[in-house]
């Protein structure tokens, strides 16, 4: 599968909206897609493309502005990634962020050196020149730093806009050429004045207009789906989550009965979910859903399997086998619709720049069910109208299409379902234990009116047994882990500081109502270093 996020601009989604386009040249930063998200929050379309994109290609795209991302390299590494130096002569406003600022300085004749002391985390930023880029930013504010190199000498024509105690040159500008740089990360939530700075660049310097709206996206996505699909039939694997449900509503509005949704019940969903899903789509919204009970097939694939990556692969491969068999029975179909999102692509094919070779290298985190299991000879053509959206944007689109709030606000749920929330081998007994524990978690979170405050809240079953005492009897049973996190987009997350009495109620109910469990623990790990899911 081609990941256009990190290569050339995606002209299939947002083509008309790209008249107000900000492009981000990605130098391997973990925050590149977050920059895009922040710009979209200002209602301007933004995409991440390769740092190797030439000035000529950029000129053809005609973006309103260019942002150079941060990155893990030093500009003086032998094979440090370099942008085309001709971009400085395009006359397009450019903002360099961290490594991007250092690269700007180096290529334009300034000096970058290893800092005496690196700067990481929150730092007080002092504004020296509150001109266009820093308009409406407090004279003293907090920004997020992450750099070991620093600019020590400016290129001709540049001036200093801001400093910190450890970094004398923390923001720079050449207003006549509309070239700007910041040593900090304005896109990170910890940067107090970051959003104001980004808005200044987008609106005051790049002169953009707010055209990236939910209504505009829906209108254009429907138009593009109709143009691509024509009178052909489309098959969609419906999971009941916000992504596939939003996609189903969008496609149904675009092509009506040309869409067939297939719900494959692998046996790894939460308690009562298959029944609720079918009732909602078939009876309430009259969208055709073909139900396939494949529980035994999937469970048979996992007998004796304990490795999480092997679980994902087997589930993904079996899903495709079932999907292809059923599609032949129901077909023919020309297109397969997928609800691939930005975070899916980011986590499945994260990239860094190898300082020794200068080449991109994949940093494998884990396979995502919806992007990692497709065979090379897939006979469907793909339709992925949501692939450039972040989760919060998908929710906005779903809401605008009339999707019920119970689905719009549904917590993210992995494609392999409870199979990757059971560590070790998946068995019918363990599935039943986890379903019952998970139901209690959801009931109590809703009763406490905290469901919408959390990004995810779920239970994990561990493959070990612990000693306990219940009544006068010694027990030897499973522990359950509670995993509650807060997040904006799933790219980073923090463990949720929920009330102790809520945790106590959940723990008491689980150990008393779920046979086979005698211990409940709470996970207080953030992402990074951990991931949200345990597998």
Curated annotation (Swiss-Prot):
Enzyme class per UniProt: ligase
GO CC, one annotated term: cytosol
Enzyme Commission number(s): 6.3.5.2
Residues the record marks as active site: 98, 185, 187
Superkingdom of this protein's organism: Bacteria
Entry keywords, A to Z: ATP-binding, Glutamine amidotransferase, GMP biosynthesis, Ligase, Nucleotide-binding, Purine biosynthesis
Domain spans labelled GMPS ATP-PPase: 212-410
SUPFAM superfamilies on file: Adenine nucleotide alpha hydrolases-like (SSF52402), Class I glutamine amidotransferase-like (SSF52317), GMP synthetase C-terminal dimerisation domain (SSF54810)
Reaction(s) the record says it catalyses: XMP + L-glutamine + ATP + H2O = GMP + L-glutamate + AMP + diphosphate + 2 H(+)
Domain Glutamine amidotransferase type-1: 21-211
Sites where the protein binds ATP: 239-245
UniProt pathway annotation: Purine metabolism; GMP biosynthesis; GMP from XMP (L-Gln route): step 1/1
GO molecular function: ATP binding; GMP synthase activity
UniProt keyword annotation of Nucleus present: no
Quaternary structure and interacting proteins, as annotated: Homodimer.
Purpose of the protein: Catalyzes the synthesis of GMP from XMP.
Name listed for the protein in its UniProt record: GMP synthase [glutamine-hydrolyzing]
């Amino acid at each position: 599968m081609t990941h256009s996020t990190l290569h050339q601009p995606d002209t299939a989604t947002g083509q008309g909206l790209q008249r107000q386009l900000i492009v981000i040249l990605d130098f391997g930063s973990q925050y590149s897609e977050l920059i895009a998200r922040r710009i979209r929050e200002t209602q301007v379309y933004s995409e991440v493309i390769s740092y190797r994109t030439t000035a000529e290609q950029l000129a053809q795209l005609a973006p309103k502005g260019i942002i150079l991302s941060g990155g893990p390299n030093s500009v003086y590494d032998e094979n440090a990634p370099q942008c085309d130096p001709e971009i400085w002569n395009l006359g397009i406003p450019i903002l360099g962020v961290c490594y991007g600022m250092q690269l700007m300085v180096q290529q334009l004749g300034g000096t970058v050196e290893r800092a005496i002391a690196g700067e990481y985390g929150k730092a007080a930023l002092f504004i020296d020149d509150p001109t266009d880029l820093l308009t409406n930013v407090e004279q003293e504010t907090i920004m997020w730093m992450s750099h070991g190199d620093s600019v020590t000498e400016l290129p001709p024509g540049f001036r200093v806009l801001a400093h910190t105690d450890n970094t004398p040159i923390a923001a720079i500008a050449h207003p006549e050429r509309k070239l700007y740089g910041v040593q900090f990360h304005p896109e990170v939530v910890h940067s107090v004045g970051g959003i104001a700075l980004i808005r200044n660049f987008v609106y005051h310097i790049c002169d953009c207009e707010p055209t990236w709206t939910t209504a505009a996206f829906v209108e254009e996505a429907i138009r593009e789906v109709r143009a691509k699909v024509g009178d052909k039939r489309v098959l969609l694997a419906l999971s009941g989550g916000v992504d596939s449900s939003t996609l189903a509503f969008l496609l149904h509005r675009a092509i009506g009965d040309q869409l067939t949704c297939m719900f494959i019940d692998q046996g790894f969903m939460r308690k009562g979910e298959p029944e609720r899903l079918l009732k909602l789509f078939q009876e309430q919204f009259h969208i055709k859903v073909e139900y396939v009970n494949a529980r035994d097939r999937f469970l048979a694939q996992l007998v004796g399997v304990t490795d999480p990556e092997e679980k994902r692969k087997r589930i993904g491969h079996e899903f495709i086998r079932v999907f292809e068999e059923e599609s032949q029975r129901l077909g023919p179909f020309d297109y397969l619709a997928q609800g691939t999102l930005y975070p899916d692509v980011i986590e499945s094919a994260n990239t860094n720049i190898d300082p020794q070779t200068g080449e991109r290298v994949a940093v494998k985190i884990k396979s995502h069910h919806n992007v990692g299991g497709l065979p090379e000879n897939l006979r469907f053509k793909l339709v992925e109208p949501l692939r450039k959206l972040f989760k919060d944007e998908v929710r906005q689109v779903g809401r605008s299409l009339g999707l019920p709030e119970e689905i719009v606000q549904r917590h993210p749920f992995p494609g392999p379902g409870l199979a990757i929330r059971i560590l070790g081998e998946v068995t019918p007994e363990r599935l039943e234990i986890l379903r019952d524990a998970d139901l209690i978690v959801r009931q109590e979170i809703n009763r406490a009116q905290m469901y919408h405050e959390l990004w995810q809240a779920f239970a994990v079953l561990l493959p070990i047994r612990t000693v306990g005492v219940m009544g006068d009897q010694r027990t030897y049973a499973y522990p359950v882990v509670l995993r509650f996190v807060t997040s904006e987009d799933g790219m980073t997350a923090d463990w949720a500081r929920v009330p102790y009495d809520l945790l106590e109620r959940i723990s008491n109910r689980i150990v008393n109502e779920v046979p086979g469990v005698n211990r409940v623990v709470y996970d207080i790990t953030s992402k990074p270093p951990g991931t949200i899911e345990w597998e």
